[in-house]
Amino acid sequence: MLVGFIHGVMNTDNTTISGETIDYGPCAFMDVFDPATVFSSIDERGRYAYGNQPQILQWNLARLAEALLPLFDDNSDAAVEAATEVLSGFTAAYERHWADGMAAKLGIAAPDRALAEDVLKLMRLQTVDFTRFFRALSAGTARTLFTEPEPFDAWAARREALLPADRAAVAAAMDRANPVYIPRNHRVEEALAAATDGEMGPFRRLADVVSRPFQERPGLEDYAGPAPVSRTPYVTYCGT
């Protein structure tokens, strides 16, 4: 969630008991921030949209709990009560980790949920690229990403009051939390198309770029940039 990753088909058989997702077929990374972002061709109703993923994971956990109920207690009511108690803690645990992660991305010392949610709303309303925004924020150039910067200016003033004194250290810490490179969808398609034709160079190049996602390197500006404007939405498939 903190890097804009969308699994695509995050159902129960693609979620392991260890809490990890698997089977990355139609997965993709979000460009412009929008909680409703869906790429998978089979997700017609947006069940596994970016913003739904936390709730989907909780739902998957509930299905696991149902399968384990006989092991919790011989009394079915007691078993359900025990499972419900554990599952009820998911939302608070997720939100705590999300808030901590957003604080690191924003460079503030302590989580501020309102500050984080407000800037995400601005990004959605003004179609700002999710990954580029946070790197631009640490570089002091985020204002240029907004077509109407005044709301961002007001938000930035609130953030300014929460920043630690050592701004250079803040920027360095933010760059350790915010990737400059992600597997941009158009780059993935480029690599797939070339590999299909027997040319592995673009894949190896992309793999090298994203293997060090936080380290900005000269000559890789095209890999940090947004996807070209497309007339048709990007679609992924289970075979991808």
Predicted regions and their residues:
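Catalytic activation segment of kinase domains across protein kinase-like and atypical kinase folds
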Residues: 2-7, 11-70
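Regulatory N- and C-terminal appendages and interdomain linkers associated
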Residues: 39, 44-240
